[in-house]
Amino acid sequence: MQRVISFIGPKNSGKTTTVSELTRGLSMNGFSVAVLKHVEKGSLEYNKGKDSAKHFEHGAQLSIASDGEISSILVHLKDGDDPGSINERFLFNVDFVLVEGYSKSRLPKAIFITGASV
């Protein structure tokens, strides 16, 4: 059974550190883990002009570039895609999905609070 949890909170509250350490611990214990991180619109960079980006720009729904060790995946999302639908479409074969952000989703959440935000 897949387990999905979202980690939300203000910047510098420990979300990324927690997700990274959970990923390490779960992976070391034999679990498969996917991490989905919400970022600001327009902040993602990809290699324009490279073949994988060209395929994506010309309409491929999914474009994967791989060097044999690491892969980069570009996916066109539908309007309103949330982590639940992204998970259903692409992350179906992992034990844990750790989501950083997506505070408005209906996913179970771990909420990080800093002294300044209390």
Across the structure, where does each feature detected by a protein language model lie?
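The conserved Walker
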Residues: 11
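Phosphate-binding/switch loop-helix module in NTP-utilizing enzymes
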Residues: 75-105
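Hydrophobic anchor at the beta1->P-loop junction of P-loop NTPases
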Residues: 7
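N-terminal phosphate/diphosphate-binding loop that engages ATP/GTP or pyrophosphate donors
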Residues: 23-77
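Conserved lysine of the Walker
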Residues: 15
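Walker A (P-loop) ATP-phosphate-binding motif of ABC ATPase nucleotide-binding domains
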Residues: 4
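Conserved C-terminal guanine-recognition region of P-loop GTPase G domains, centered on the G4
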Residues: 101-118
